[in-house]
Amino acid sequence: TPAGRLKCELFSDIVPRTSENFRQLCTGEFRPNHVPEGYKNSIFHRIIKDFMCQGGDFINADGTGSRSIYGDKFDDENFTLKHDKAGLLSMANSGPGTNGCQFFITAQPCPFLDGKHVVFGKVVDGLLTLRKMENVPTGANNRPKMAVRITQCGEM
């Protein structure tokens, strides 16, 4: 059952490299070996109610995959933007300079993530959809018990 659409705005004026990585992974423009790679048909593999929904691992679908338009990983662009509200898009990572394809969407302000994760966009339409995603039952490792999938994505 489709949960709905998330319409996002990217902060390309503040974090142009991070925004461009996300944009190309949404549109399918990233084509290593002439085959589109990106978020279409990928899942949100980790959901924690009242915290965030994490997805974007189109490699392994479990949080271990990393790829970007700049190589497997790229540096933190800057930490100008803060995790100060729900609906922010931010890069998931495994430490400094390990950005790839994974991202998360905040469910509430998360100031403890400031200076550690790069905020690069926000949900401008679809916060109700985000709430539906956030309330999907989860099991071990906060993995949703039903697939929360990106069925279509692109640029508007």
Swiss-Prot record:
Function: PPIases accelerate the folding of proteins. It catalyzes the cis-trans isomerization of proline imidic peptide bonds in oligopeptides.
SUPFAM superfamilies: Cyclophilin-like
Reactions mediated catalytically: [protein]-peptidylproline (omega=180) = [protein]-peptidylproline (omega=0)
Name of the protein described by the UniProt record: Peptidyl-prolyl cis-trans isomerase H
Source organism of this protein record: Mycosarcoma maydis
Enzyme class of the recorded protein, top EC level: isomerase
Gene3D superfamilies associated with the record: Cyclophilin-like
Annotated gene: CYP3
Main location group: nucleus
Limits of the PPIase cyclophilin-type domain: 1-155
GO process annotations (BP): protein folding
UniProt keyword annotations, A-Z: Isomerase, Nucleus, Rotamase
